[in-house]
Swiss-Prot record:
It comes from Brucella canis (strain ATCC 23365 / NCTC 10854 / RM-666). Coiled coil: none annotated. This is Deoxyguanosinetriphosphate triphosphohydrolase-like protein. Belongs to the dGTPase family. Type 2 subfamily. Transmembrane segments: none annotated.
Length: 402
């Protein structure tokens, strides 16, 4: 397979790409825009939403913005969107749809990253649980209040199915995680608007999913080096990183550690992107899909790492879990964040009047499950800083996350 010619000039859309001219439309019908495709409108609505702005103050790994240069959900999302567009361009897909799915994929994340999600899921275990992907769907179909004619953003079918299924089907023989029940909010919405949960999502959504992996694999290394939790020497334990570092050290023997780290990160992104493009080309040549429907009916994803790169990526992930995500200083802050989220849930569930007017109005008429879901919606929308301030206001004993 060849990378020749990619990125230089116009290349005709592939027949298996998502075509905005044949979009399945929106849950609430709207007149089409004369100047933008449906997927471009989706991207624009996502960017202008409140949920998108909140990503600025939600963390990836490092809690409470321990430095101005660490990544937040917003910077991560922008990086994922850039990689997703690059992959879509290389494979002659619809770049706007790939970008839209990438931009919306993290909307449902709680404050304090996966720590906040785990804490909220624990409190919601008797009320249907909490899942950030399902929460993303709730935000774009219900919780955003911007438009006169509908709740949410009324995104196109293609963007919604990409959001819900970008990591693979949720039901059926090809379900990515058959042992995990589908979150109830997804099932509830799917009963109104069938997202075909047993079939694979578009190639554009698959680009967004693998772009997420590429981005955080590389950029968590960057942040870990910046924080001093990782060293270039420790990264020599990872075969992929060592191979790239050897190239950098040979070419630039006197390069300072900061630039060496950046050279590693950029080369890792490049090698992973090129691997995905070449592997996708191989899978497409083998499957020979002629239409978008053929993509949906495949027995596996057509965009992904090669077996060799997937094996190397697993080694890298194990290294990051051991040396970064479970580093003592990170774990201490995660325990504090866990306590903040659970304290806030308990307080607001017991006394809904503690929530702002827009959230507490009508709570007296809700049963326990509905009240728990409203409290979860409120907490999930918090930024890290707002959660800390609210905890301090209510308890005056907030753990120090700085």
């Amino acid at each position: 397979m060849s990378l020749e010619g990619i990125g230089f000039g116009y290349r005709e859309r592939a027949p298996y790409a998502s075509n905005p001219a044949f979009s399945r439309g929106r849950l609430v019908p709207e007149p089409e825009s004369p100047t933008r495709t449906p997927f471009q409108r989706d991207r624009d609505r996502i960017i202008h939403s409140t949920a998108f702005r909140r990503l600025k103050h939600k963390t990836q790994v490092f809690i409470a913005h321990e430095g101005d240069h660490y990544r937040t959900r917003l910077t991560h999302t922008i990086e994922v969107a850039q990689i997703a567009r690059a992959l879509a361009r290389a494979l002659r897909l619809d770049e706007d749809l790939a970008e839209a799915v990438a931009l919306v994929h993290d909307f449902g994340h709680t404050p304090f990253g996966h720590t906040g999600e785990d804490a909220l899921n624990e409190r919601m275990k008797n009320f249907g649980g909490f899942d950030h992907n399902a929460q993303s769907l709730r935000i774009v179909t219900k919780l955003e209040h911007r438009y006169a004619d509908f709740d949410g953003l009324n995104l196109s079918w293609e963007t919604l199915e990409g959001l819900v299924k970008h990591n693979g089907p949720l039901l059926g023989p090809y379900a990515a995680h058959p042992d995990i029940p589908v979150p109830q909010p997804i099932l509830d919405f799917n009963a109104r608007y069938d997202l075909e949960l047993s079939r694979f999502a578009s190639l554009e959504a698959q680009c967004a999913a693998i772009a997420d992996d590429i981005a955080y694999n590389a950029h968590d290394i960057d942040d870990g080096l910046r924080a001093g939790l990782l060293t270039l020497e420790s990264l020599d334990e990872v075969p992929l990183a060592k191979r790239l570092l050897d190239i950098v050290r040979t070419r630039y023997p006197n390069l300072d550690p900061v630039r060496t780290g950046h050279e590693l990160v950029r080369r890792q992104i490049t090698i992973m992107v090129e691997d995905v493009i070449e592997e996708a080309q191989r899978r497409l040549a083998s499957a020979r899909p002629g239409t978008m429907e053929d993509v949906h009916n495949q027995p596996r994803a057509l965009v992904g790492f090669s077996d060799a790169m997937r094996a190397e990526e697993k080694v890298l992930k194990r290294f990051l879990f051991k040396n970064l995500y479970f580093h003592e200083s990170v774990v201490v802050r995660r325990h504090a964040a866990d306590r903040i989220v659970q304290d806030l849930f308990d307080a607001c569930f017991t006394d809904p009047s503690l929530m702002p007017d827009e959230w507490r109005l009508g709570c007296e008429a809700l049963d326990k499950a509905a009240l728990a879901r409203r409290v979860a919606d409120y907490l999930a929308g918090m930024t890290d800083n707002y959660a800390v301030r609210e905890h301090r206001r209510l308890f005056d004993r907030t753990p120090d996350l700085a």
